[in-house]
């Protein structure tokens, strides 16, 4: 929004043109979202307390967590508001990728909000009925797949249309899985569905300790932002042998907003947490990360960078599958972070060590850009 204002002012005073710079706008998006979170954070927390939107803690979880009962939840509203305001201010709003990400944020945030609200209203940690929850999450993921496929079909040359659908294989130069060969985009849409829903639920499962999920979200958003920048610049894309997709240039603004909003939220979510993001934050942030990975065609690199989320989700799948088949548990408790609590790690130790792992994984994911 403001980029158009400053471009117009640039006709009268040339330095205003500098604001149209992509890197400067990305930094401003970080600062704006961070400032928004810091300014309104305490107000949101006080409001959530006044509304008695306290977290319900499962009795079958770690007993040390029972002291967190009543801590305000649904703090993800603060994160999403900061992202929305910052993106609307600094992104070029004629870019369809920006609007898709904002719509994803709203859809998945709304589902998460309904889930959180039902947990609070009925004092029941289960929340929204599973089939209803996954129906709406599926609708959101399918919306992304169909929208991106439609945008790909509008491209003037067939090569770009293919690149916007085919799955890029990191490290191997010019290797791709040709989803574009499947008629009507069915292969691409189905794959997109699993990436987005998988990412959304994986982040949600990770959000179980103070500060555990939000910093890895910030780190992965930074990594994907770098990949969006590369993919959106024809020179870097050609040099690094990644698909050039012009729309990705503005995606870095959304990534910047996610970074700023996440860091601002961490201020209040660090141990001992004053507020939890809830499903409204976790589901939407995960879905946005998954969507950006699809937009940049870096789904495999995303799985590496978000390896912490992958491990948390796999731990639940293994635990449930093992118990149903063998009546035995693989871990003392799932998701994975609870297993380490059960073997004697303190909550702060689990969080700090998982953060270190997240940093390493993001670096490894970024290395795939150069190793080709």
Curated annotation (Swiss-Prot):
Key words, A-Z: Cell cycle, Cell division, Cell inner membrane, Cell membrane, Cell shape, Cell wall biogenesis/degradation, Magnesium, Membrane, Metal-binding, Peptidoglycan synthesis, Transferase, Transmembrane, Transmembrane helix
Bilayer topology annotation: Multi-pass membrane protein
Enzyme Commission number(s) from the entry: 2.7.8.13
Matching Pfam families: Glycos_transf_4, MraY_sig1
CC cofactor: Mg(2+)
GO biological-process terms attached to the record: cell division; cell wall organization; peptidoglycan biosynthetic process; regulation of cell shape
Family classification: Belongs to the glycosyltransferase 4 family. MraY subfamily.
Name of the protein: Phospho-N-acetylmuramoyl-pentapeptide-transferase
Gene transcribed to yield this protein: mraY
């Amino acid at each position: 929004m403001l980029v158009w204002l400053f471009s117009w002012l640039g006709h009268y005073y040339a330095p205003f043109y500098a604001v149209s710079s992509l890197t400067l706008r990305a930094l401003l998006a970080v600062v704006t979202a961070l400032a928004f979170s810091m300014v309104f954070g305490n107000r949101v927390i006080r409001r959530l307390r006044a509304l008695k939107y306290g977290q319900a803690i499962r009795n079958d979880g770690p007993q040390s967590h029972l002291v967190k009962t009543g801590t305000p939840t649904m703090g993800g509203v603060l994160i999403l508001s900061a992202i929305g305001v910052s993106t609307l201010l600094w992104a070029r709003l004629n870019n369809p990728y920006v609007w898709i990400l904002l719509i994803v944020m709203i859809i998945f945030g709304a589902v998460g909000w309904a889930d959180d609200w039902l947990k609070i209203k009925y004092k029941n940690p289960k929340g929204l009925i599973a089939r209803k929850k996954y129906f709406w999450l599926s609708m959101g993921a399918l919306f992304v797949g169909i929208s991106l496929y439609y945008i790909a079909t509008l491209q003037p040359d067939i090569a770009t249309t293919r690149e916007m659908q085919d799955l890029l294989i990191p490290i191997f130069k010019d290797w791709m899985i040709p989803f574009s060969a499947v008629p009507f985009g069915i292969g691409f849409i189905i794959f997109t569905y699993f990436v987005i829903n998988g990412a959304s639920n994986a982040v949600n499962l990770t959000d179980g300790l103070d500060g555990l999920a939000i910093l890895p979200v910030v780190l992965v958003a930074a990594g994907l932002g770098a990949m969006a920048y590369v993919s959106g610049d024809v020179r870097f894309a050609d040099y690094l042998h990644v698909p050039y997709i012009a729309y990705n240039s503005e995606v870095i603004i959304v990534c910047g907003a996610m970074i700023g909003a996440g860091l601002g939220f961490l201020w209040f979510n660090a141990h001992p947490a004053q507020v939890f993001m809830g499903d409204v934050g976790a589901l939407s942030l995960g879905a946005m990360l998954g969507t950006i990975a699809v937009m940049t065609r870096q789904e495999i690199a995303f799985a590496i960078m978000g390896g912490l989320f992958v491990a948390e989700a796999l731990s639940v799948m293994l635990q449930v599958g093992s118990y149903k088949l063998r009546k035995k548990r693989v871990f003392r408790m799932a998701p994975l972070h609870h297993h380490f609590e059960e073997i004697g790690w303190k909550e702060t130790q689990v969080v700090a060590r998982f953060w270190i792992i997240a940093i390493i994984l993001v670096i490894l994911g970024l290395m795939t850009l150069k190793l080709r």
